Amino acid sequence: NLFILPDLPDTAIPTGANVTYFGPGVHNAGVIRIANERGRTLYLDEGAVVLGRVEAENASDLTIRGRGVFCSSQENHGDGRRPQMEFRNCDNLKIEGILLRDTPNWTLKIVGSTGVHIDNIKEIGWIMNSDGMDFICCRNVLVENTFQRNYDDNVTIKAFNGKTDYVTAHTASDGSFTDASIWTVYYLAQNKFDVYDYEIRNCVFWADKAHNMLVGPEARGIAFRNIRFHDNIVLENRQNDGIYPGAMAVMIADNGTFEDIAFENIIVEDIDGGKVFCAHFTNAWAFDGLYGQWARNITLRNIAYTGTRATPSWIRGRSDAQSIDGVTIGNFTVNGAPVTDGSGPHLEINGYVRNVTFE
């Protein structure tokens, strides 16, 4: 595929002692580690190609921006591959304007962080697990104006338990983790935050496999609330299995609770497969094999799918106790025709879903 991603010049180039500047040309940066710092900026100017990856921990007011390219093509893409950029317990993180390509694993892994703003970035990833953005136990997150072509999930919102003893036992003196397994992610959320206040807007998503917009399934008994996806476009989705379907999905799992989750003003183009929307109970990726506790107040509004290959969407509770309560569906259309009930050819709603309103 040829991607043409024009952008306006950046005239506000930062200077100062806290700025690491990458000018035009190729820079072999290796692993950029940022720990216990305030006010650090990495600036990639137009024409810069920075080779490496980022690990940041306990940083505040951290900014990575510019018009350059951050590329991990020279990093390990085999066993023990790491995310392209990894942030743990950071406050007021901003990533803006850059293009990220060829991640070995997750592109942006953001754990236990508050006040995250991601704006106008572009991602191109081809490898399995090349998720675009994975938010784990984060709060107060705004994602806007992105273009993401990832092999795996584009945006996923999760929660894991903090296992500080594991972190301590596998941390080297320089702050890096000696366990390079991709599953180290499970142990990095040192603060077990509830997950709330997310807005993901004005984005273009292409997922070769997996979801475009996903809440769950990893939850560890944590509450998810006030999550809104709106004014986004889905170009591609191919996942069509019984466990992980849905360009937009809420996977109610792992003893978590899920409420006030909205998908609004979403255009889904003629995807190769999968479902437009799916909300269901599952124990996929549940640490103790548990399903979710409950979900309530899920909104689908102004959802337009045009195509013939998507399979019917699902909204499924599991039992009277493990139910979905409060679903609002307004102007959900398939090829221009409105979906007006939960028993037609495009949407299935089972008997464990209560208080459904079609507007």
PLM ranges: what are they?
Residues 1-359:
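Extracellular/periplasmic carbohydrate-active domains that bind, remodel
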